[in-house]
Design a protein with these regions (language model features):
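Charge-dense, helix-prone N-terminal extensions
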Residues: 2-167
Length: 167
């Protein structure tokens, strides 16, 4: 008798599964219909991207930069990669970082686009903006500023040959 009961329950279960599979869905499963949320913008207008190493998080950061900043971010990234082959990338503290493996970080950009040279006082000519940190110098790029790519590339090349900042 127990055998007949288990056979009946197996048949009933098989019918339920077949009936469910045959019914068309009214909506897509939630995992398919979810839209990828855009990163939140922080108070300074920068995208909030999770801390991670590699090119992908830096590209996500650049893609999420608002308006004119996105174009500057792409240009900076291209210039840095062209100037320092094999450059290491990461996002830390909601900012993209660029460095040399085993030597630390050499620069970052944030805000309006603020390029931070961590050993900037060793660069010639000095990047224009001073910092409260004795070795750091900045290049601030605003929406209508012309970007001197030759000078920026020279600073990036010089910075890549100096000891980096360990973070």
């Amino acid at each position: 008798m127990a055998n007949k009961t288990s056979i009946r329950s197996k048949k009933a279960a098989a019918k339920r599964v077949a009936a469910k599979a045959a019914k068309p869905r009214k909506t897509e499963p939630k995992s398919w219909s979810r839209k990828v949320a855009k990163p939140a913008l922080l108070a300074g207008g920068n995208p909030q991207i999770a801390k991670a190493d590699g090119d992908a998080p830096v590209q996500a950061y650049i893609a999420a930069m608002p308006g004119w900043k996105r174009d500057i971010g792409r240009r900076l990234d291209t210039l840095i990669v062209r100037t320092v082959p094999g450059v290491r990338k990461a996002v830390k503290w909601n900012s993209p970082f660029y460095g040399i493996d085993g030597q630390g970080w050499l620069l970052s950009f944030t805000r309006y686009v603020k390029v931070a040279f961590f050993r900037g006082t060793s660069l010639r000519p000095l990047p224009p903006a001073a910092s409260k940190h004795k070795d750091v110098r900045y290049l601030d790029i605003h929406e209508d500023d012309a970007l001197d790519e030759a000078q920026l590339a020279a600073w990036v090349k010089q910075a890549s040959q100096l000891p980096g900042e360990r973070m």
